[in-house]
Amino acid sequence: MQSFTREQVQETLEGKGYKYFTGGKYDVNIVGIRNSSTGDEITNKFDDTMTVSYKDEDGQWNYHEYKCTTDPGKYWAENIMNKDGVAIVKPGQYRGSHQVGLHQGKYKALCQRKPLKVYRDDNRDDHYDLDESSVQEGIFGINIHKAGKFVNGSTQIDKWSAGCQVFSKESDFNEFMELIHKAKDVWGNSFTYTLVDSSDIC
């Protein structure tokens, strides 16, 4: 997992013309950072970074980073569920895209409620094909959830993601959701998700 600063994330988003939330307490910025150093290789590892930045009750900035994947695992890249191919979220800012809900009816997570753009890769090789001609926009169940109950975190993505944004460690995810619930109490049940490439970080 690569590490960044809150200031880098803010500068990157604002440089792209995206909204960086600077309002009152728990006005959260949820930003996934996809590891560009691996290119289009399917690593099947949790080598991306989920970041959350916000002001606390005292108006002080807080910043958290978590190990995650923003890519589908090798299993679903080879065992495709959708005839058009496995889904890979396209970098961008998706305003109000997620709400607190039940992931697969099991536990609370951030669930997709508005359209996202995804690339579709259907050739089952060892690389993600990020072809603009394959891009689809819609509601595909791209949730933000956890891999499982592994104390030290899951090391391989495998079946944990067919396109979802997935935390490696349950404890990290639980901490994330505590922040989300605090934000929900203040701002309502609507969350913006932003995905950028690490090569875009200022």
Segments predicted by a language model, with ranges:
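Cell wall/extracellular polymer interaction/catalysis modules
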Residues: 1-158, 172-181, 187-191, 198-200
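Residues immediately within or flanking Cys/His clusters that coordinate Zn2+
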Residues: 161
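Cell-envelope and extracellular/periplasmic
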Residues: 169
